[in-house]
Amino acid sequence: MSFATSLPRPTTTGAAGFGLPLATCISLSVSHSFSPKFGICNNTSLRLKSKAGSGCYEGIHRSQLAASTILEGHTPINPEVESEKIRLIERIRLMFRSMDDGEISVSPYDTAWVALVEDIGGSGGPQFPTSLEWISNNQLDDGSWGDRKFVLYDRILNTLACVVALTTWKMHPNKCEKGLRFISDNIEKLADEDEELMPVGFEIALPSLIDLAKRLCIEIPDNSASIKNIYAKRDSKLKRIPMDLMHKKPTSLLFSLEGMEGLNWDKLLDFQSEGSFLSSPSSTAYALHHTKDELCLEYLLKAVKKFNGGVPNAYPVDMFEHLWSVDRLRRLGISRYFQVEIDECLDYVYRYWTNKGICWARNMCVQDSDDSSMGFRLLRLYGYDVSIDVFKQFEEGGQFCSIPGQMTHAITGMYNLYRASQLMFPQEHILADARNFTANLLHQKRVTNSIVDKWIITKDLPGEVAYALDVPFYASLPRLEARFFLEQYGGDDDVWIGKTLYRMLYVNCNTYLELAKLDYKHCQTVHQLEWNSMQTWYRECNLGEFGLSERSLLLAYYIAASTAFEPEKSSERLAWAITTILVETIMSQELSDEQKREFVDEFVNISIINNQNGGRYKPGNRLVEVLINTVTLMAEGRGTDQQLSNAWKNWLKTWEEGGDLGEAEARLLLHTIHLSSGLDESSFSHPKYQQLLEATSKVCHQLRLFQNLKANDAQGSTSRLVTVTTFQIEAGMQELVKLIFTKTLEDLTSATKQSFFNIARSFYYTAYCPADTIDSHINKVLFEKIV
């Protein structure tokens, strides 16, 4: 029996491509009735209504409407929503163009230390009277000073500092009395506070302020157990501070000099950065008080002017702001609107990049792993040449720290180091060590439910960490990451912890969140309409009769839509999904060698005939017909019929001969996507293209083998397998990452290179994630509404 007669044949065949009837028209109606498991529409929002029920095959050229329905997609958007979207984009662009030394909230604590400085000209008055004015104008109703988020450590420290400053200059006794009442009512409650929320250097700063208050005859209740405990911590920490070392080389102690005694200012002044001590206004104000140094004065005058009398807890914070703002745009899925601004941001960061890393501000003499990790990750993602040497000073004995010499493990610092380590190139062993260390640490914190950070109070840090651990970089589909981060990102409500609580206005910003939600909703609408079209195509092609399930259909579309998610990439997205579906359908057929040969021969021969006579010859086999119609419609208007036919012929030959289908499928998908996107044909022979093609197809072959081994495992060890992939796969992905994220002379475009990573990532995702996890992701990405 020949293959042409062995498969079920429909009694009526659609004449148009994809098996659809001729003269298809479109009728839109909104519906959100989805299957709870897979999100499959019960009432499709996009109906394809036939005006001609059937007919003989008269050529693909008559099916333009069906082609536009499936392959061009739809991008409906309310004009008012579009106008709001444009407004938000312009607002964010203006924010980025105005970036300078950092938009950050004022710290009452630091402002009080600045206000304490006596006029260096000898008048006996305050050097910065506007700082006293700021303090006077910013007391809260309960008598305290501090951030709008109530954290007692922050309120006590800020309030005592402001009371000391006002009392020193004999100003506003009523405000001082009100502040002292707040302190008296709350200071004993410090014993009940979560120590993870304790500001930087609190155990040094609070006793110093209490001692200052006593000299001013301010009565502070200091006999409570909580205060005695803080004094004990102060004494213990001071004993551990290497005073000789801090005078010999820069350390993080430069950030918290205020109140410390026995300092050699002549030596410490050598460690200034643009006039400041680690960009700390309070530390620099303390230095100015003792030294009358002109550089300290210039730095503080600039800061006080910038913030209208107040000063932040750190300034500048330009590296911090530039990097974290870019990171937020990327993770929210809106970075494509700001490519120019992102390039400018990263050019700025790279200008101050060193092989020892960076700090939160430029030209600092101390570096930290958090900023260095974020900088390394983003710079490498955008093709900058960065060395792994930046991580050497943060590693000791197999462990990694936030700041050299301090073996502290702040969650966000370790989280960002973990994210950076996943961009390793081959043989970058220190990144492998960093990944193992941080993954283990974060996992332990997760299982003990102790993901609380010392640097930030954010909406859902446990969720961010969980996503990073559960969906590694190689498997993280762009729309999936954005969907999760939309729920994790707190916008304006996120607050950072320094010496006091503070806000980074261009990092944690509701404007980003508003745009991201509008953009996601628009993309999701487009995807749902396309999915409805896909279901109609599936039914009209009778693919279910060939054994293809609707779950497989949905998975194929989800993978494509989660990666090439932009509305304008509809052709690429649908070509990707449909190619995947047809590959799976053909592979699922149980055919003899002869039947495979007949299938391939019929495809090749009819493709040649149709290319010669305009597409008038109808195949005898229904599945061959669907395939030929599909290829023809994908190429329609692009003149790529022959190239697509050849790509399919190569895959079919591999299938016929029992060759490596994982590798062949990757090649087919890449050629299809590139032809659908209009990539110039000359790029296919580019040396870098060939390198990427080889590396991608190789790793996809390994991933498909691994996935098949998982599926066929009869010993119940799937749970173990899904947590780790083979060494060969990891090495292959590292090599691919190096090829994609390294810029060379006469390189391919970033978008073209990224497409290779997208295909490899989709294979990795399906091999790595369990089926039930993927099902939950499908519902979340495609069908759950954004609130």
Curated annotation (Swiss-Prot):
It is an enzyme of class 5 (isomerase). Mg(2+) binds at D368, D370. It is found in: Plastid, Chloroplast. GO terms for cellular component: chloroplast. Its cofactor is Mg(2+). Substrate binds at K237, K454. Inhibited by high concentrations of magnesium. Expressed in peltate glandular trichomes of leaves. Highly expressed in the first leaf pair. Changing V200I: No switch of product outcome. The keyword ATP-binding does not apply. It catalyses: (2E,6E,10E)-geranylgeranyl diphosphate = (-)-kolavenyl diphosphate. Optimum pH is 7.0. Keywords: Chloroplast, Isomerase, Magnesium, Metal-binding, Plastid, Transit peptide. One of its GO terms (biological process) is diterpenoid biosynthetic process. InterPro entries: Isoprenoid_synthase_dom_sf, Terpene_synth_N, Terpene_synth_N_sf, Terpene_synthase-like, Terpenoid_cyclase/PrenylTrfase. Changing S369V: No switch of product outcome. One of its GO terms (molecular function) is magnesium ion binding. Residues 1-47 form a transit peptide. Its EC number is 5.5.1.28. Belongs to the terpene synthase family. Tpsc subfamily. The Asp-Xaa-Asp-Asp (DXDD) motif is important for the catalytic activity through binding to Mg(2+). Involved in the biosynthesis of clerodane diterpenoids natural products, including salvinorin A with potent agonistic activity on brain kappa-opioid receptors, thus conferring hallucinogenic properties. Diterpene synthase that catalyzes the formation of (-)-kolavenyl diphosphate from geranylgeranyl diphosphate (GGPP) as the first reaction in salvinorin A biosynthesis. PANTHER family: ENT-COPALYL DIPHOSPHATE SYNTHASE, CHLOROPLASTIC. This is (-)-kolavenyl diphosphate synthase, chloroplastic. It comes from Salvia divinorum (Maria pastora). The gene is KPS.
